[in-house]
Amino acid sequence: MTAEPPVVLERRDETRNMARFYVISVEPTLFGQWAVVRHWGRLGTSGQSRESWFADLDAARAESAGWQRRKRGRGYRSHTVKPAERPSVLV
């Protein structure tokens, strides 16, 4: 049981003063379940987070894929995270 690398999405629109991030990861829990951890907010802030727990990895991956699809549909794009840029929430 290992965690999958997080998916980091960003949405920027200077005309609307918008700079947002959305991080989605699938991680094992201490109880043998899987958690989809979502972390979001304005770039430069600590943001908010929420966890959803699932009994099996396939269900957690499906939930993660659903959130990624919704966010990409709203204009979020992939952001490549270099180790030096990683937000503290990902370390």
Regions found by a protein language model. Give the residues of each.
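A broad, low-specificity signal for short, low-complexity segments enriched in glycine/proline
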Residues: 1, 11-15, 40-41, 72-74, ...
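Short N-terminal "domain-start" leader segments
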Residues: 1-35
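Intrinsically disordered, low-complexity and often Lys/Arg-enriched segments
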Residues: 1-6, 78-91
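Short aromatic-glycine-(Arg/Gly/Cys) micro-motifs in beta-strand/loop hairpins
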Residues: 24-51, 65, 77, 83
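A short, charged, amphipathic alpha-helix used as a generic interaction element across diverse proteins
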Residues: 46, 54-73
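Alpha-helix boundary/capping detector
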Residues: 50, 62, 86-90
